[in-house]
Structure formats: structure tokens, C-alpha cells
Amino acid sequence: MSALSLAHGQTNLPDPIKVPSGHKLVLESVGVGEITYECRGKANAPGQTEWFFVGPKATLNARDGQMLGSYFGPPATWQAKDGSTITGTQLAVAPSSSGNLPYQLVKANPAQGKGAMTGVSYIQRVATRGGVAPSLACTAANKGQREVVSYQADYLFWATN
């Protein structure tokens, strides 16, 4: 993919999720989908429960609505329409506005397959809307219950200059 004009200025983003210098934006997408949560026992806190992030399922679209690929997990996987895929490791998160997923910076693993994901080294999640754990109480009475919440986020894919 050719380099795109930078629609999201790095200067307006929190420092922890800024992409290191020496990288260019190669793909910009709007992820629209759902995140599944499950009411589970809280780790290292006997008798307590919490909503646990199970995984995402989203379509990645261009600004004009053209479908570019998908995002799913676990593990967190971005797949282009051409079949190329990447997974990654979260490096940092930063707060977004109330009721929205945090911003995120992910270090990409080498792509599987040749295509749009080849050469991607970082993924940013910004402009988040929704996606946080359900407001429904998670208690011993509904342990094991799954809830699905809608979300939207911009996913920005970066490669070395």
C-alpha cells in the first residue's frame, strides 16, 4: 500500500501511544464491531467477580466504507482482505474519554502472507467509541454470563520509512 497522508497527527495523542519516529502511516481503517465480555471470578481475589475481556470481532473499513479486512481474537489479529495477517504485543494504553476503550499502541509481529500487512511494525487504536465492559453487575449469580458490547475505533498501521 502507498503511504497515506497523516489524518491523525501524533502531536495530539498521549505520549505513551505515539509511534516512534522513523515510521510512516501505510493504512488507515475504521473498525466497527463488537467486544465480548464474560463475568468471571477475579484473579487473586477469592469471592470477587469482574467482567473479563474475551475478545473482539470487527470489520475494518476505509473512510469511504470499502471493506479492508477484519480484526478478531484472541490473539489480537488484523487480517487484510488479501489474506495477509498480523498479530502483536500491546506496548501501551492511554485513557480515552469516559465510556470508551483506551487508546492503544501495539508492536506488530512479522506478517503472515504477502499483502497489505507486510511491513507493518506498529498499530495504533485511536478515536475509540464504546467497547467498555458492560454496566450490568457481574456477581456470583451471573458468573459465566457473556455480554457483547458495540464499539468503533480507528486502527492506524505504521511501517518503517
Predicted regions and their residues:
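Bacterial N-terminal signal peptides
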Residues: 1-3
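Primary mode marks residue(s) on the alpha4-beta5-alpha5 output face of response regulator receiver
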Residues: 10-36, 43-161
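Boundary at the C-terminal end of the N-terminal hydrophobic targeting segment
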Residues: 5-9
